[in-house]
């Protein structure tokens, strides 16, 4: 049976609310028409009511702490109170892990880095009421070279994914076209959230969620990225 983009989108935005139940989300197969939007943010947390009033299906939230040099990221990490409020409003919440950025990127230490970051992702996801059997996205917020992928990113993702699998979760990857393409070839990940940096205007056919560059909105005073 073929899967529509709508079904894939819903699968990538499974509720984190405590006690959430449902069948295991299907693996993403192909891009189709986008029939909804989901937001991500870090500077603060818009209310569930404001998100719903803006017409979005939910939010992708950080299961990672703020960096010491980024205390402005008041929206990190996601909390149980937030996911409960989202669920009560009929909104979905998905999880993504990203602590470092650029010269402090989580993937720079390869598999050893996953040993540090994967347990944190799992712990914060659980603390926010996140069920097993759901994807946690791993961020590759860069435009890496093939050499960086082979030497650092692939080992990082494989080790992180292994930890997620062992804990009962699925693997999502946040990256550009090339990262997704390389991951698909290597069998890493079931869900793919694509950003446009270095993607050359292309959308990978295995994309589950697409974060289009410079597509933002202010909701409840918080700047949010809009994803389809």
Task: Describe the role of every protein-language-model region.
Residues 52, 87, 165:
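Anion (oxyanion) recognition and catalysis
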Residues 38-40, 58-62, 93-97, 134-139, ...:
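Structural recognition of the beta-strand scaffold that forms the well-ordered cores
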Residues 32-51, 180-228:
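Functionally critical loop-and-helix segments that line ligand-binding/catalytic clefts
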Residues 19-33:
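C-terminal region of N-terminal signal peptides and the immediate post-cleavage residues
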